[in-house]
Swiss-Prot record:
Note on cofactor: Binds 1 Ca(2+) ion per subunit.
UniProt xrefs under InterPro entries: Alkaline_phosphatase_core_sf, Sulfatase, Sulfatase_CS, Sulfatase_N
Protein name: Arylsulfatase H
Pfam families: Sulfatase (PF00884), Sulfatase_C (PF14707)
GO terms assigned for molecular function: arylsulfatase activity; metal ion binding
Protein location: Membrane
PANTHER family listed in its UniProt record: ARYLSULFATASE FAMILY MEMBER (PTHR42693), ARYLSULFATASE H (PTHR42693:SF16)
Keyword Transport in record: no
Transmembrane segments: 167-187, 189-209
Family: Belongs to the sulfatase family.
Length: 562
């Protein structure tokens, strides 16, 4: 690759796509010809790993090249591991540098079409401190939150009954505190500052509004379509969003075809509620989920066709992936609505099991990368940041730890061994698993210190709660569960000192790596604190009259870019 080439860059990220859902990764029941075409014309990674098994922390790591614990984009609570309210005050800190910001500074036109889910506002409704336009994107068209079942009035809300119960219990407990404090104050037993009473009363009110709004306002408040800083649909028309996003992406490519551009197309597919166009309904052999996968593949094809029509294909790096593994728990009666993770154990929300973090990884750049290559080395979504920095002709900043590695030597065939020696797999703030890729051989060891408890037992998922816990209802392993992933990728045969002579030395090496890794961590504000994640009326984006927000400006505005 010539460093002054500055290719166009198109990043395609699916939402909750299982690595086993694509034909090029072994699926024979769903048709994905366009993604398969990318794989046959490019390089396919078979051990490509998300930095987290949940969307928000995974996307934060993807954009910054850093473990999400470094930016505070992880939760210490099982209740909130991704943002549940658009009117919260947490988000990707503005002092984090995204690859979009790097490329923007190097002359690229940058656009994000689709899902964001990394926060919106800090202190007031319109400050938009976490907005994509404050993280290096010139243009944004999409959903600042995400697509949930709540966005369809006819579907069961994803704010589950157990969450509502916890919100109600918290409301009652917090409401009792100021009441109990008023008794000694008025009885003059001892003095209680009014400020303390007010704080507890305010918290009780916020928890109450979160509980109350979960019964009817979530669609109106969370399901919003924006162009740059403007709300254009509230609530969004979920059945039309995919078509609108595709139209915007094609317009972006056409507008900037004569200058280097970065287009990050962040699909709403294949997250539940699996909304597909009529022409795709019933098309696949795998029900509603398969229909949604096939519609996503069709959209990929339209983007590739646009690059071909504009004669940009040879000068464009195209990358396809997913933010995490398939979600196993969503059900419609007895029918599973989530994806398939192939031979890999576990799924979305499970900190260390392969099924939650092993994702597709496909790169196509016809003028640079050899077609049809397959790479089995451990790689990470965090690698995109340093890779794009290299491609864009820049040098990585030295003022922070970057956990990703430049993939170009591996992709071009100039290197045969991944630069990742250790990878750390977190579940929220808790380190669950460590992966060690030995420098002198192809062996990849994986040690689980914590694993989730499946319910019902033996099902391989957490159907009782909708998603597995990071702490509390988990199993701690001492010594850890050890697997040789290079020989046992399904994690079916745990090793022990009796059947693996290197067991003790491998564990010792990993524990030394954990200590070294933890020395590189510095305290940062936690974006998933209780205060940051609860709903705040003064932060709620609203087009129209609050709280009955609503508008539809989409028909009045044509696709555009700055």
């Amino acid at each position: 690759m010539t460093r002054n080439a500055r290719p166009n860059i198109v990043l395609l990220m699916a939402d909750d796509l299982g690595v086993g859902d694509l034909c090029c990764y072994g699926n024979n029941s769903v048709s994905t010809p366009n993604i398969d075409r990318l794989a046959s014309e490019g390089v396919r990674l078979t051990q490509h790993l998300a930095a987290a098994s949940m969307c928000t922390p995974s996307r934060a790591a993807f954009l910054t090249g850093r473990y999400p614990i470094r930016s505070g984009m992880v939760s210490a609570y099982n209740l909130n591991r991704a943002f549940t309210w658009l009117g919260g005050s947490g988000g990707l800190p503005t002092n984090e540098t995204t690859f979009a910001k790097l490329l923007q500074h190097r002359g690229y036109r940058t656009g994000l079409i689709g899902k964001w889910h990394l926060g919106l506002s800090c202190a007031s409704r319109n400050d938009h401190c976490y907005h994509p336009l404050n993280h290096g994107f010139h243009y944004f068209y999409g959903v600042p939150f995400g697509l949930l079942s709540d966005c369809q009035a006819s579907k069961t809300p994803e704010l589950h009954r157990w969450l509502r119960i916890k919100l109600w219990i918290s409301t009652v407990a917090l409401a009792l505190v100021p009441f109990l404090l008023l008794i000694p104050k008025f009885a003059r037993w001892f003095s209680v500052p009014w400020k303390v009473i007010f704080v507890f009363a305010l918290l009780a009110f916020l928890f109450f509004t979160s509980w109350y709004s979960s019964y009817g306002f979530t669609r109106r408040w969370n399901c919003i379509l924006m162009r740059n800083h403007e709300i254009i649909q509230q609530p969004m028309k979920e059945e039309k969003v995919a078509s609108l996003m595709l139209k915007e992406a094609l317009a972006f490519i056409e507008r900037y075809k004569r200058e280097p551009f970065l287009l990050f197309f962040s699909f709403l597919h294949v997250h539940t509620p699996l909304i597909s166009k009529k022409k795709f309904v019933g098309r696949s052999k795998y029900g509603r989920y398969g229909d949604n996968v096939e519609e996503m593949d069709w959209m990929v094809g339209k983007i590739l066709d646009a690059l071909d029509q504009e004669r940009l294909a040879n000068h464009t790096l195209v990358y396809f992936t997913s933010d995490n593994g398939g979600h196993l728990e969503p059900l419609d009666g007895a029918v599973q609505l989530g994806g398939w993770n192939g031979i890999y154990k576990g799924g979305k929300g499970m900190g260390g099991w392969e099924g939650g973090i092993r994702v597709p990884g496909i790169f196509r750049w016809p003028s640079v990368l050899e077609a049809g290559r397959v790479i089995n080395e451990p790689t990470s979504l965090m690698d995109i940041y340093p890779t794009l920095s290299y491609i864009g002709g820049g040098i990585l900043s030295q003022d922070r730890v970057i956990d990703g590695q430049n993939l170009m030597p591996l992709l071009e065939g100039r290197a045969s061994h991944s630069d990742h020696e250790f990878l750390f797999h977190y579940c929220g703030v808790y380190l669950h698993t460590v992966r060690w890729h030995q420098k002198d051989c192809a062996t990849v060891w994986k040690a689980h210190y914590v694993t989730p408890k499946f319910y019902p037992e033996g099902t391989g998922a957490c159907y009782g709660s909708g998603i597995c816990s990071c702490s509390g209802d988990v199993t701690y392993h001492d010594p850890p569960l050890l697997f040789d992933i290079s020989r046992d990728p399904s994690e079916a045969l745990p090793l022990n000192p009796d059947n693996e002579p290197l067991f003790d030395s491998v564990i010792k090496k990993m524990e030394a790596a954990i200590r070294e890794h933890r020395r590189t961590l510095t305290p940062v504000p936690q974006q998933f604190s209780v205060f940051n994640t609860i709903w705040k009326p003064w932060l709620q984006p609203c087009c129209g009259t609050f709280p009955f927000c609503g508008c539809d400006k989409e028909d009045d505005i044509l696709p555009m870019a700055p």
